[in-house]
Amino acid sequence: MSLLTEVETPIRNEWGCRCNDSSDPLVVAASIIGILHLILWILDRLFFKCIYRFFKHGLKRGPSTEGVPESMREEYRKEQQNAVDADDSHFVSIELE
């Protein structure tokens, strides 16, 4: 149960919980949402690299190189790198006086 809805008090030398409205639908919904949030947070921290890489690049994975000779693969890599290098020339350095 949620710490916000329960009060723990010592009862007969043991810790017990006095909450009469634990069957309230709002309390149940809040507990479920809290548990789901905790699970998602833990998964996010464990797999954040995979998750954010997926969202950044999506399902795009470049063309398949299966059955392509290594020389053609290298040529394709060079073309792609040259295209990236050419894009760098579009940036203009502005100096303020």
UniProtKB/Swiss-Prot annotation:
The record marks H37 as: Essential for channel activity, possibly by being protonated during channel activation, and by forming the channel gate and the selective filter. Residues 71-80 have a biased composition (Basic and acidic residues). Pfam families: Flu_M2 (PF00599). It is found in: Virion membrane; Host apical cell membrane. Residues 44-97 are intravirion. The M2 protein from most influenza A strains is inhibited by amantadine and rimantadine, resulting in viral uncoating incapacity. Emergence of amantadine-resistant variants is usually rapid. Glycans are attached at N20. Its main location: virion. Coiled coil: none annotated. Belongs to the influenza viruses matrix protein M2 family. Cytoplasmic tail plays an important role in virion assembly and morphogenesis. This is Matrix protein 2. The gene is M.
